[in-house]
Amino acid sequence: MMITLRKLPLAVAVAAGVMSAQAMAVDFHGYARSGIGWTGSGGEQQCFQTTGAQSKYRLGNECETYAELKLGQEVWKEGDKSFYFDTNVAYSVAQKNDWEATDPAFREANVQGKNLIEWLPGSTIWAGKRFYQRHDVHMIDFYYWDISGPGAGLENIDVGFGKLSLAATRSSEAGGSSSFASNNIYDYTNETANDVFDVRLAQMEINPGGTLELGVDYGRANLRDNYRLVDGASKDGWLFTAEHTQSVLKGFNKFVVQYATDSMTSQGKGLSQGSGVAFDNEKFAYNINNNGHMLRILDHGAISMGDNWDMMYVGMYQDINWDNDNGTKWWTVGIRPMYKWTPIMSTVMEIGYDNVESQRTGDKNNQYKITLAQQWQAGDSIWSRPAIRVFATYAKWDEKWGYDYTGSSSTNPYYGKAVSADFNGGSFGRGDSDEWTFGAQMEIWW
């Protein structure tokens, strides 16, 4: 008994050590931004985005507190085989008060199994909700290829000249389908499940320092038996993507061409949309009706120009042509140079211009925005974070058209009808004006 009692503290200590080691093995990653800002004409900070544009230049132009908190752990490993569990919870509030309650968005919960298939070494099987191989332009927070959502797939299959990945994900729309008619009136209140099937061939070395990635995405509305969609709804569509990545000036340049049809044109990033509807108080249905096509040509990157200068840049042309004439032509160009005074202090400027033409009216909206920021960051790269910055932003815009949401409860552009600024004696768009803001912000990823 004495021997047993003497061994007990040792066993407890060993168990505690094992539990501590396991706890330390948990990976904690994430992203967050928050700050405070003011508008020159009074009130809290305003943010500036051109009507019809799908993004905005973000430096000194973000008006919310946003965070993604990721916890993950390799839960099993034997040789080169392993299972990894990953999660991600996101929050967003208006940063107007101390206590701002919000419902979290459960964005990721998946398991990834590596090297589980003997005859496909290096490949990964996965299932669950996941940020899946997302492609974006950081300086305008624009995701141009992103099929994230609940799904499953097999990725990084070595085919000799590149890596092949296969995936299926889902993005449901609120409303859009109906099971039966009462008095010959269909009530399209049932949500519609949209499936996306994705095939990618990446890491193809085609020139010194350059790689090519090709992808095909097919999206479709997946209706329940005996259900129907709103007449004219976009039921399916395709997205084709080609992206060339070139190593240059201690950074990279990405040149992208994308072409989409019908349901894949609304967001233009690989998620199928076009079956959902919005309702007013009388439950009248407004169909998205986005049959048509989209062409996008994009060039963006980040480079180092000597010891003291870094720069991000973007140039993009996007043409969405819809059968209902509610499409747009959008082109944008911008730069973000950074001068490094010390390894942890820099001055950053961002200059961006947007121009959006309405397919229906032929009118154009345009805006340019300039931000100057003094920044302290953890390192001497334009990608170094965390960063604390103080900024001043000036924006000037001239908008000749806007969206008319008469009869619709939604303010999604795809439910609104593009009209000239003075349509029916109204005032649509933001008119011709300018404004400036100033404030401070932190940004971090880890």
From Swiss-Prot:
Marked site positions, Greasy slide, important in sugar transport: 31, 66, 99, 252, 383, 445
CDD domains named in the record: Maltoporin-like (cd01346)
The reaction(s) this protein catalyses: beta-maltose(in) = beta-maltose(out)
GO cellular component: cell outer membrane; pore complex
The entry's keywords: Cell outer membrane, Ion transport, Membrane, Porin, Signal, Sugar transport, Transmembrane, Transmembrane beta strand, Transport
Localization terms from the record: Cell outer membrane
Top-level taxon in the UniProt lineage: Bacteria
Swiss-Prot/TrEMBL GO biological process terms: monoatomic ion transport
One Pfam family matching this protein: LamB
InterPro entries: G_neg_Bact_CarbUptk_Porin, Maltoporin, Porin_LamB, Porin_LamB_sf
Residues flagged as site, Important in sugar transport: 143
Record-level Gene Ontology MF annotations: maltodextrin transmembrane transporter activity; maltose transporting porin activity
Membrane topology: Multi-pass membrane protein
Leader peptide range in chain numbering: 1-25
Induction line: By maltose.
Main function: Involved in the transport of maltose and maltodextrins.
Subunit (UniProt): Homotrimer formed of three 18-stranded antiparallel beta-barrels, containing three independent channels.
Family: Belongs to the porin LamB (TC 1.B.3) family.
This protein's name: Maltoporin
UniProt source species: Escherichia coli O6:K15:H31 (strain 536 / UPEC)
